[in-house]
Amino acid sequence: RYGKNGGSGITAGKVVQSKARVGADHTNCTATAAVAAGETAISIETNGTDITADQYAEGYLWVNDVNGEGQCLRIKTHNAHDHSDDASISFTCYDDLATALTTSSQLSLMENPYSAVIVAPTTHTGPAVGVTTIDMTASYYGWFQTGGPAAVLTDGTITLTGPVVRSNGTAGAVEVLDSDDDAESQVLGQTMAVNATTEYSLIWLNIGP
């Protein structure tokens, strides 16, 4: 997948994740006004935190509760937003709204998962979205591998053909799936060839299409 590196350089063979969401300020936001089915423009009342122009472009606006819940729309464009001046902000989406919204509808925001990736930290702050295949300069665009054979930093002892998850001990690495500790973690792939800890093993990635 094509995306943008975040504010720090990343070397090859590292697991990367999407940057952490803004959180509560852009979650459970109510619709500013009722929105009819078929519309692509949706205005919401944010709970805080300013938004730069097109910060959420190619990201997602979804209805998480009440009328219209279950819909997820990809954002095309929006203006800058100063929350202290006006809590409302309008988003233009690519797809039409299928079910109408009311002012009780609750909506949430997510930036494009590939808009500013970071090395996957040992404490999860977002989903893993790929692996770097070359050294990448900070804030540059490039490709992140999501499937097939990839050399990936290894933490601990992994097993041939066994599933691997992101490491909780070394940022950007994979480790063997521990069913006691990692049963609900995101499985990133299966081991094709085992190399020693701190080296790079060959992993068949299953992160995404």
Predicted regions and their residues:
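Extracellular receptor-binding modules and their adjoining Ser/Thr/Gly/Asp/Asn-rich linkers
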Residues: R1-A53, D65-P209
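Short conserved beta-strand and strand-loop elements enriched in small hydrophobics
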Residues: E58-D65
